[in-house]
Amino acid sequence: MAIISSVRLWTAQDALTSSGTIGTALRLTVPILLAGMAGLWAERCGVLNIGIEGMMIFGTWAGAWGAWQFGPWVGLLFAILGGMFGGLVHAVATVRFNIDQVISGVVINLFAFFGVRYLSELVYVGKKGGGISQSPPQKWALPKFNLPILSGGEIAGWKSPDFLGWLELQRWFILGDLGGIGRGLTHSISWATVIAVVVVPVSTWVLWRTRFGLRLRSSGESPVAAESLGVNVIRLRYYGLLISGGLAGLAGGTLSIVASSYYRQGQTAGRGFIGLATMIFGNWRPSGIMTGAMLFGYAEGVKLVASDSITASFLFIAAISVMFFIYAIIRRKRMQVLIALVAFCLSAIAYRTVDTVPESLTQSLPYVVTLIVLATANQRLRPPAMAGVPFRPGEPH
């Protein structure tokens, strides 16, 4: 926090930690977080889910249709059901018929893209505001709220003070940044965001603290041993993929219902694959996935709200690289020392020589961050041992 606050003061780029940037980043984090959690549930039960992108597409279309017909809450339910349909197709293909899991995921992505386009032609063409590539707008927006006292929310009709907003306006060292970040996280919050955040601790508790979670993880670590102990691996993989599909569908629903008010072709924009990157970055752990999703969401938020601040972010990266360089030397990690040194040199040169960032590079920032994170991810990654390996019950292994 001290580093980013120093960078903000040095470069006079208040947008780096403004409530607008953080609020936008939070909204953009939600679908990536849910996509990452969808990948977690699938791979923890032993099945690769490359089809998250397609399940999100099902969710965007079904959610927008439900919101158009019945309102946003029903729309979110339809989004979950749409994603679960994709999860069920993937389960039948990979668990029942042992089709290659990567091929099945790719086919689901293609089927979703062309399938919803066909449905749009049947349902939306000729309707007011609709067409082959978009749906009519939803009936009303999903409710949002502000936290009382902190961000000006109401208590029994009384409008409370906006303490964090006041603190942000002071722009004091560290405190002003905390005010901007805090207000961005507590002002104009959608209930869909709350649901997405709750998914993280609930998934952690279910997967690591319940009998069901233990059995599901065992089907991804050692299905043969699990079967010998009486665990129904096939059934658990169906459950895992249905949950995975539901979360992916909900991720798509937040795009067409919360981030927008209608379905639009190409709305997912590769977020399903970025979600898979957050899963790897997070080492197949919910807390790590949330950290990765926040990183990608912030990168996209800066791109949309504070594109003029991207050059200032080079200085922030350089400062972080110095700290990472010192840490790597202390831990005697040669590869990480080299990575930190290269990152420092590139970011320092970019900060000193680049005045404006080309629009094409600005638009690709989230994907550049994805590549950097995957290239520098912890080498001690431990995926589920049998994720992606076909399993046939009752056969000798």
Question: What residue ranges belong to the model's regions?
Answer:
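Transmembrane helix-bundle core of multi-pass membrane transporters
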Residues: 113-207, 263-266, 309, 358, ...
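Cytosolic-side transmembrane-helix boundaries in multi-pass membrane proteins
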Residues: 1-6, 151-157, 203, 221-235, ...
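Inter-helical junctions in multi-pass inner-membrane proteins, predominant
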Residues: 13-24, 121-124, 207, 211, ...
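Helix-loop-helix "hairpin" substructures at the membrane interface of multi-pass membrane proteins
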Residues: 184-262, 286-287, 291
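Single transmembrane alpha-helix segments in multi-pass membrane proteins
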Residues: 20-76, 80-106, 276-289, 376
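Helix-loop-helix hairpins and the membrane-proximal interhelical loops
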Residues: 1-33, 37-41, 45, 387-397
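Short loop segments and helix-boundary regions at transmembrane helix junctions
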Residues: 43-47, 86-169, 209-211, 267-270, ...
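Short, non-helical or kinked segments that cap or interrupt transmembrane helices
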Residues: 41-62, 95-108, 215, 238-239, ...
